[in-house]
């Protein structure tokens, strides 16, 4: 193989977009879409990619399959708990599926106008944060991505 051919083979293909290695699944109720969008923007500022079902599952796609696929791809779950979402079946499904994937999964419950005692049982053992502490989480996430924080 010529030198030129070897160089060309090493270059990433334009047809194959690169996906950041660190992906965060953001679970939320549809009524909290605006807040979830802001959380995704902050997460993406670290270099991570995000999944949000209302944005990333297309019309006609199978919703549970799409969620399961993204849960497998994601390293962390940020679940926005609000008065509208805390008892919603989809939020419970996402948290349960992520927790079931591996017991030591990093699940961050972000509380927005709800109390700590409203956190679903399956993720109560995980440290939750207030929406007002989200920037601190983003700093920790950036450290994990750079490999400087656990």
Language model regions located:
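Short acidic-hydrophobic, aromatic-tinged amphipathic segments that line or gate anion-handling sites
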Residues: 128-133
